[in-house]
């Protein structure tokens, strides 16, 4: 299991005159063994698409929330204000959970992580930034979905 890389030119870029800038996409699977690869590519990221399996969500909810929390609190993501899109895959399946359900469950799990990690002294937290950023981000997401 490894990440996939590709570069391509957007159709809108092809129509422009002058220098055409390709988009570089890196697909890093959510397996724990590949987390170091994510740390390697995040500082260069202009955006993150975090994919959640809507059909098999409950069995992977804690792991997904933990991975999302780690991604959202990385210094490189916070400092550069990297846009994060949470994408629910397999929503066309009959047994898939709704995006609203997934959003609420992820928020609950992330809040659990925040509370437990806030209890740890700041001296013990490594490579994490102010968790207030995460709170503002969640409020922003809530405001846009209402």
Please give the residue ranges for each predicted region.
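Switch II (G3) loop of P-loop NTPases
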Residues: 17-36
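Inter-motif core of Ras-like GTPase G domains
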Residues: 34-57, 65-78, 84-87
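Anionic-ligand binding region
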Residues: 61
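Core residues of folded domains in eukaryotic genome-function proteins
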Residues: 2-6, 19-24, 44-48, 80-84, ...
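Conserved Walker B
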Residues: 29, 54-55, 90-91
């Amino acid at each position: 299991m490894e990440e996939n890389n590709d570069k391509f030119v957007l159709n809108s870029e092809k129509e422009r005159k002058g220098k055409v800038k390709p988009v570089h996409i890196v697909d890093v699977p959510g397996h724990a063994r590949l987390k170091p690869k994510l740390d390697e590519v995040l500082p260069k990221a202009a955006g993150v698409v975090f994919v959640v399996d809507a059909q098999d969500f409950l069995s992977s909810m804690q792991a997904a929330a933990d991975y999302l929390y780690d991604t959202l609190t990385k210094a490189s993501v916070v400092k550069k204000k990297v846009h994060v899109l949470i994408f629910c895959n397999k929503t066309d399946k009959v047994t898939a959970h709704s995006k609203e359900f997934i959003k609420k469950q992820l928020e609950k799990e992330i809040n659990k992580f925040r509370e437990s990690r806030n209890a740890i002294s700041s001296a013990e937290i490594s490579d994490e930034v102010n968790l207030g950023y995460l709170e503002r981000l969640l409020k922003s997401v809530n405001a846009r979905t209402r």
